[in-house]
């Protein structure tokens, strides 16, 4: 059994060369790194221990030209300012941009809710946008973005629903909220469930909103991402969505969302689309006294008797969308709409 160890730090100090975990060791996430705050917040046992920081609701990675945006949370400052996947943020107020130190200039974080000027490169166009960060932990931000993503739209004579589950948690409140979000889409002819760039845990109760026989997930030697930490979730009423559903995944879908996509895509009415997930279903523990997490792969965990760590899920319909391909539309989303219209 792999055990998740909570890390609680205060008064962290940061350097200018911060980036996401993709640019550091694959097995360690430093506190100089935006991903550190995502892991810390989701692994904390209560709201008081989650570290808040000033941020604008982006994920990304450091490149020579600047910070490459890989995703933008709905309803957050970057989204409201019109920033898109594939944009490169080159500077903040004329200084090199860093997603952590750029908005958190003091070692002990405190709200800095003032407007900042970003220089952004989109293809060959360089432009500026003003953003005012929010001061919030990333657990709350990802959960809020879940709700903000909800939409319905007409496609031909059909109604398609859309929901991006940015973060999955195991609290009863969040399990019920996901069920309520799905209920708002209950009358749709089909739903696009977006799990791209998503993170979090998985309980069998997450499957209740999609599967009638949700308890049949076959996991051996389950690590902390699956083991339930609450006693009330099992009493949540099951009223699963029974119509066609397209699930979007990519190489940045990590942890519980990977298994959610894997388990639900077994049904003929549910189709996965996008690019392969990384198979990152292990756990994190504090790296000694340092401000970092070490990643422990779930090498002994088996899903339906098969090794999943480092392998991940290959979507039924593969459609790569490289970050280097900058476009105004979302080809994976558009393909999901076309796919649903062909089966509903």
Task: Provide a role label for each language-model segment.
Residues 78-101, 191-193, 264-267, 272-273, ...:
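Conserved PDZ fold ligand-binding element
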Residues 89-93, 163-164, 184-200, 248:
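Short acidic catalytic loops
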Residues 1-8:
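Sec-dependent signal peptide recognition
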Residues 172, 180, 198-248, 252, ...:
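Gly/Ser/Thr-rich loop/hinge elements
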Residues 96-188, 312-321, 326:
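C-terminal, low-ordered peptide segments at domain boundaries
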